Amino acid sequence: GQFPFPRDMYADIIRELYKREAGLVVFNVLMPEKDRFGKDNVLGNTLKQYPVVLPALGSERSKNTNHGSPAQVVGMDPAGLVVEYPGLINNVEPQESLAAGVGVVNTFPEIDGVVRRMPMVILSQEQLHPSLALETLRVAAKDPRFQVKISDMGVEAVRVPKFGKIPTDDVGRVWIDWSASPREFSYMKLPESFDGGIVVVGLSAA
């Protein structure tokens, strides 16, 4: 949506991160509406120059254009065997078509409401779409496809060829390691160099 900054500021952030030797930038900021400041083309021009992975959201409805999925499915039709959403909310143009990759950010709460697992893939509009994490691995590896093997028992394997198999349950979910402590930085206090690492950009009201 519109919160909180005009998108030329996002473009500035992307350029600054690559100036500081980011290997890949991932934006966990969905942009389903046009920028009210009219800066979508400024961000689009930056996405032409620098690889950035953007999010999408599985939903009851669809919004904006889905440009397909880099999935290679081996085996059975995934319908009824993976997490499924009728629609997909994508980013506005030109962001969606210029992104290096697009991955969904849906979680999968347990019956008690706690999020312990999240899907690596979802099915929407008859296509298998990667999670933001899986798409980040694919883009970082420069692989044209990610692969999913499906049998009548469900998901048997999810993999990006360069990184190997990702262990999932039979509907393609992975357990979340909440004990992991990724390095966090304020935009006002960035390191001199990210040494080729993957940088995930999120927003906080704090």
Language model segments and positions:
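N-terminal domain-start motif of subtilase-like serine proteases
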Residues: E184-D195
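Short, well-ordered turn and helix-capping elements at secondary-structure junctions
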Residues: I122, A180-P182
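Non-lumenal N-terminal regulatory segments of integral membrane proteins
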Residues: R173, S181, S204-A206
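Non-transmembrane functional regions of envelope-associated proteins
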Residues: G1-D169, S193-A206
